[in-house]
């Protein structure tokens, strides 16, 4: 018999910024790093003989909670990857909701009907994950393995193992980041002993402010973004007086939720470029939308804007400037 701990990766940028990451690589957030530390404490006294992870960064980084303290090698496997979401990759969920609402509804509630250009089918993901787990179980007979994968992939695998048809997948939860499921494999049979346990995340800071709730019926809403013409917004006087207006031609993105403007972020590509910084001269969230997780989605757009330029950090004005109110025409 083989014991397998099946573990979802820690919080990554796509989770935080509300971006469809699928098989795209993304970094672990600060909260994700704390989740990894909590996971390491959980497994400190649990014997593990082998550690496997998908070859994406977020799973490999999460797997360090186990393989590094125990001095084990990490076995990277492409067949443990998340479902490929095709043309949705690296789009915001808000943009997807605007462009393809019918398929997003299918993705959230009727995954067996979902398909977009370039994407894997859910059935293909189940076949891929089942084969991977069976191969790992056979290679570790009589041992215990930790296997790191992704939210949708794990959900599909557990449904297949529990005999839940794809038509009823919407009734099952998606485990939290670093949630653990326990499998026992003997021959061709793989039993789900328990699933989606995140009891190691005892500190509210591990989950407070998360933009994705663990629920069966879908995802929290995200923003979509459009370029904002300077004449469309009156920049806050206090901000302009301190930092000066963005240089001519500097891009400004407005974030919208269901057609309603929520906030804006501006970029100054030339400022502090020699220091590897991405300068954000303005980050503004309108009063009704503050403290609801939308400001960090604006930050996510700055990350996506500056990372291809090789910038490895962001700089913002003083904190008093970060929450200035934006007025919209």
Regions from the PLM with identified roles:
Residues 5-72, 76:
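Active-site-proximal alpha-helix that buttresses catalytic centers in soluble enzyme cores
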Residues 31, 289, 293-301:
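Conserved acetyl-CoA pyrophosphate-binding loop and the N-cap/start of the following alpha-helix
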Residues 70-128:
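Phosphate-handling substructures
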Residues 79, 283-290, 318-320:
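A short, internal acetyl-CoA/4′-phosphopantetheine-binding micro-motif in the GNAT/acyltransferase core
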Residues 87-95, 160-230:
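Acidic, low-complexity terminal tails and accessory targeting/binding regions
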Residues 157, 296, 308, 320-329:
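Conserved active-site alpha-helix within GNAT-family acetyltransferase domains
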Residues 230-282, 286, 299, 305:
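Acetyl-CoA-dependent GNAT
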Residues 306-318:
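Conserved GNAT acetyl-CoA-binding A-motif
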